């Protein structure tokens, strides 16, 4: 059943991409028109006092359609999450699970457990009270009514840093700790409350300790990576992004995995797709860091890689915001032909607005694109420019320019699905 589900998801995404090609003359004419439109946009007054880099690749034709300042190093902002997501799906796979374990170290004597209860953190950013209650229910099923011992929290999944490298001191984002409950880092008090509500008394105190050898895993909650990618990408959730970033780090199997370990895997992927990781700087998984530097070209290559890699594409594509429909693109509607067509990640920090993703041209060609606007007084100006680019990419030819053979009688078109 699971394999069938994955197959159907993949076929669905392929169906979205596979559009019947129109005659080559019409496609070539549209490509030239798109280039002309983008050339005109380079005269936009916004670019007189700010910087812009763009990379547009025709995946269907396997050709570079347009590039401007594509090699300039710029801050990707939350488009950094594209790098994190693609690397995670490539390295860990779409079946990867975030794991939170409940362990016992001791013995039961009647309704009392003599020993410690341990929660092993797996940096699940979405862990909820109801899910932890499911773990606690296992204790009740064993007849445990009281615990004569301590609550141990094993937080060794990641290093002890609570902020990413290059984060601003006044950022109001959540601290990155490996154990959250209902989006809050105050796990201990909430866990004790849930125990009490379940009729279990915990007599000891809370301590941070490594999981003792020989401790028994009595329950484990697992969350598919796709469930974390969706809020990470669609809503640009920074905590989810850092959680995925540290799953990469933990892949090294080293205790207290650090951001440096995650960066090594990202750099390895960049090198493997034909670019040189030394030309860029990766500092975190969310894009909050001011130390991140990348190019529009890098994002174009990563998007091409994701599109052409079956284990990556379905979960990645499904996680992207859809223009005019959901996520951080739900309120964008100034590019009519982009609505429900463009699937892309947004990025925004002070002075920066970015956009990277996929769209389909009027003649059915799949494009990947990256647009980086920097040096902005108002991010809205960058978004408006990007909307004009999207309309240029997705709208068709003016009626007077459509080659005769490109006019299709839709009444005679048969669709099978």
State each model region's role.
Residues 2-11:
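Bacterial N-terminal signal peptides that target proteins for export
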Residues 24-60, 64-73, 135-141:
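Beta-lactamase-like hydrolase cores
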Residues 53, 99-105, 148-161, 202-214, ...:
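Acidic/histidine-enriched alpha-helical segments
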Residues 62, 76-95, 151, 190-191, ...:
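Active-site SXXK
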Residues 100-106, 112-195, 223-265, 294:
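Active-site-adjacent helix/loop patches that line small-molecule binding or acyl-intermediate pockets
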Residues 181-319:
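A small/polar active-site loop signature that marks catalytic segments
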Residues 281-417:
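C-terminal soluble interaction/assembly domains
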């Amino acid at each position: 059943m699971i394999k069938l589900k994955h197959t159907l998801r993949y076929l669905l995404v392929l169906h979205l991409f596979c559009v019947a090609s129109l005659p080559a003359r019409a496609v070539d004419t549209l490509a030239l028109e798109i280039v002309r439109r983008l050339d005109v946009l380079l005269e936009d007054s916004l670019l007189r006092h700010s910087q812009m880099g763009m990379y547009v690749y025709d995946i269907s034709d396997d050709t570079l359609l347009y590039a401007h300042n594509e090699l300039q190093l710029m801050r990707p902002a939350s488009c950094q999450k594209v790098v994190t997501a693609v690397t995670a799906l490539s390295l860990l796979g779409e079946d990867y699970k975030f794991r939170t374990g409940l362990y016992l170290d001791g013995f039961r004597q009647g309704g009392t457990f003599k020993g410690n209860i341990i929660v092993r953190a797996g940096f699940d950013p979405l862990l909820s009270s109801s899910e932890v209650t499911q773990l606690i229910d296992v204790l009740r099923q064993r007849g445990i009514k009281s615990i004569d011992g301590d609550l141990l929290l094993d937080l060794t999944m990641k290093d002890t840093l609570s902020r990413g490298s290059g984060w601003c001191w006044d950022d109001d984002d959540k601290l990155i700790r490996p154990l959250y409950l209902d989006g809050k880092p105050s796990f201990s008090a909430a866990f004790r409350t849930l125990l009490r509500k379940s009729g279990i008394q915990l007599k000891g105190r809370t301590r941070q300790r490594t999981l003792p050898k020989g401790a028994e895993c009595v329950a484990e909650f697992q969350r598919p990576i796709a469930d974390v990618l969706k809020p990470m990408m669609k809503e640009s959730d920074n905590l989810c992004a850092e959680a995925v970033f540290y799953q990469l780090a933990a892949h090294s199997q080293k205790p207290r995995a650090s951001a440096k370990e995650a960066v090594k895997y990202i750099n390895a992927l960049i090198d493997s797709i034909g670019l040189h990781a030394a030309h860029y700087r990766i500092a975190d998984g969310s894009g909050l860091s001011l130390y991140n530097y990348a190019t529009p070209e890098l994002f174009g290559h990563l998007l091409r890689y994701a599109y052409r890699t079956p284990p990556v594409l379905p979960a990645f594509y499904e996680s992207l915001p859809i223009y005019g429909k959901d996520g951080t693109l739900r309120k964008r509607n100034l590019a009519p032909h982009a609505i429900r067509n463009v699937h892309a990640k947004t990025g925004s920090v002070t002075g920066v607005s970015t956009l990277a993703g996929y769209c389909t041209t009027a003649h059915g060609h799949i494009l990947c694109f990256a647009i980086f606007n920097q040096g902005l007084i108002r991010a809205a100006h960058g978004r408006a420019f990007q909307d004009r680019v999207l309309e240029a990419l997705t709208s068709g030819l003016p009626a007077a320019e459509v080659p005769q053979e490109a006019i299709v009688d839709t009444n005679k078109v048969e669709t099978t699905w």
